[in-house]
């Protein structure tokens, strides 16, 4: 399980539709399905039930959603903070006196 899979899972929870979630993530439906299937295999059970082309979360899926949402949010905040620090960093300039250069 990695942060990317958790992000994909949360987007699918928001959309409750593979096609819309894949489009939002700029992925193919197949790639999204593979990622969710790998997550389900790692967690030893389904995260979603599909009936009449409608997705619903299983109990396991609801539990993962509760735990994954703050983790992904904190990760995204960390990325934004680090990116801001990198953007605000100033180059270091070193000057050498002529007498020291000789």
Language-model-detected regions and their locations in the chain:
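The N-cap/first-turn positions of alpha helices
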Residues: 2-8, 29, 61, 68
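Short helix-boundary/capping micro-motifs
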Residues: 12-28
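Residue cluster at the C-terminal edge of the helix-turn-helix DNA-binding motif
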Residues: 15, 24, 37-46
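N-terminal winged-helix
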Residues: 29-30, 34, 80-81, 87-102
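Alpha-helical linker/hinge and terminal dimerization helices associated
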Residues: 42-43, 64-86
